[in-house]
Amino acid sequence: MAKVCSVCGKGKVSGNQVSHSNKHNKRTWSANLRSVRAIIDGAPKRVKVCTRCLRSGKIERA
């Protein structure tokens, strides 16, 4: 299972980490994922969901 939200598809994003001296280093930011048991197709299943989808009630927890 990838590090991607199973509801909205949110995953890693890349960008630059900028220091005080303005040096740029490539880095990635990961989505804030939680492994939860959710009702999917009428049966409980363990899926990775981002906290934004959890808070907005886009899934029904088991």
UniProtKB/Swiss-Prot annotation:
* InterPro entries reported in the protein's UniProt record: Bacterial_rp_bL28, Ribosomal_bL28, Ribosomal_bL28/bL31-like_sf, Ribosomal_bL28_bact-type, Ribosomal_bL28_sf
User: What is this protein's gene name?
Assistant: rpmB
Q: Which Pfam families match?
A: Ribosomal_L28 (PF00830)
Q: Which HAMAP family match?
A: Ribosomal_bL28
Q: Which superkingdom does the taxonomy of this entry point to? A: Bacteria
Which keywords does the record carry? Ribonucleoprotein, Ribosomal protein
| GO MF annotation terms | structural constituent of ribosome
- GO process annotations (BP): translation
Q: What is this protein called?
A: Large ribosomal subunit protein bL28
Do you know which Gene3D superfamilies this protein is assigned to? Ribosomal protein L28/L24
Gene Ontology cellular-component terms listed: ribonucleoprotein complex; ribosome
- Family, similarity comment: Belongs to the bacterial ribosomal protein bL28 family.
